[in-house]
A protein has these predicted regions:
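Helical element adjacent to the flavin cofactor pocket in flavoenzyme catalytic cores
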Residues: 213-260
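Ligand-binding pocket scaffold of soluble enzyme catalytic domains
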Residues: 33, 85, 206, 246-247, ...
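Rossmann-like flavin
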Residues: 92-207
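Generic recognition of stable, solvent-exposed alpha-helical segments in well-folded globular domains
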Residues: 17, 116, 171, 175, ...
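Generic, well-ordered alpha-helical scaffold segments in large soluble proteins
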Residues: 25, 179-183, 195, 235-239, ...
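Active-site-adjacent bridging/hinge elements
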Residues: 32-37, 208-214
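N-terminal glycine-rich phosphate/pyrophosphate-binding loop and immediately adjacent elements
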Residues: 2-142
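Acidic/polar loop patches that form or flank catalytic/metal-binding clefts of enzymes
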Residues: 73-75, 188-192, 242, 247-250
Length: 262
């Protein structure tokens, strides 16, 4: 019987990333997946003869660090720095289109407002970018490296300048609805930006709890996967297999038996 250091149940993108990192540490890893293919919501399925799609249609803000660490480009992952357009549809045909730092389909004053908004938000996002992949140190009895992490964050916030620093602390407490109301008057533009800000948060536009931070996290990204999500899954799977990970599909887990505290 084969011995494994780690058994991972499920073969979604998070599981495949974990399996790759464990394999890089010379661990013997088994991944078991109940479905016929890997990927979870990112798996490609045929919903009609000749037509395939995944539930997850795009993987934005996939960390560049993971791409480099796992050398996913060598396994077929292609990236582009171009931001895909986000379109707010209007029944009258006057659609609003967002693409990076540009917006069309709105009056000139709204275009100017969006430029100011995007410039400020991108500045905040870039300021926070180095910290998204770091573990927040516990408060109290911190080691020197942990104290330095707090000091670095504090310094980067202070370097924003007094006015922008105050605006940052005020803004991160706002619901997205209030933030949009402060900057814009065009209802479709506000709806489009509000929707974009709340992706993945399970929050509503008027929800508090720092939903603006999720928007800043997404704005800190610099790439989108150019093809569909299954392309990312395929690259992760190929990378894992090349590192010796044993991936078994059609393998449903019925029980987890724990014996002798191991």
């Amino acid at each position: 019987m084969a011995h494994y250091d780690t058994i991972i149940i499920g073969a979604g993108h998070n599981s495949l990333v974990c399996a790759n990192y464990l394999a890089l540490k010379k661990k013997n890893v088994l991944v078991v997946e109940a479905a016929e293919v890997c990927g979870g919501l990112g798996a490609r399925h045929e919903f009609h003869d000749g037509f395939h799609a995944s539930v997850a249609h795009q993987a934005s803000h996939f960390p560049q660090k993971i791409i480099r660490d796992l050398r996913l480009a060598e396994h077929g992952l292609s990236l582009s720095g171009d931001h895909k357009a986000c379109i707010g549809l209007n029944r009258d045909g006057d659609h609003v289109i967002l693409q990076g730092n540009k917006v069309s389909g709105v009056p000139d004053n709204e275009v100017d407002a969006y430029k100011r908004y995007h410039r400020l938000m991108k500045r905040y996002a870039d300021m926070l970018a180095p910290f998204w992949l770091k573990t927040v140190p516990p408060i109290g009895n911190n080691s020197l490296p942990e104290m330095m992490a707090f000091a670095e964050l504090g310094l980067r916030i202070r370097l924003l300048g007094k006015e922008d620093m105050r605006e940052f602390f005020r803004m991160i407490t706002l619901p997205v609805y209030d933030l949009m109301d402060e900057y814009f008057s065009h209802p479709l533009l506000k709806s489009l930006l509000g929707w974009d800000a709340l992706i993945g948060t399970k929050q509503a536009p008027r929800s508090p709890n720092n939903s603006v931070l999720q928007l800043l996290y997404r704005m800190a990204g610099d790439s989108h996967v150019t093809l569909d999500v299954p392309t990312l899954i395929d690259a992760l799977q190929r990378a894992a297999v090349s590192r010796g990970v044993d991936i078994r599909t059609n393998s449903r887990v019925c029980d987890i038996v724990v014996e002798q505290n191991s």
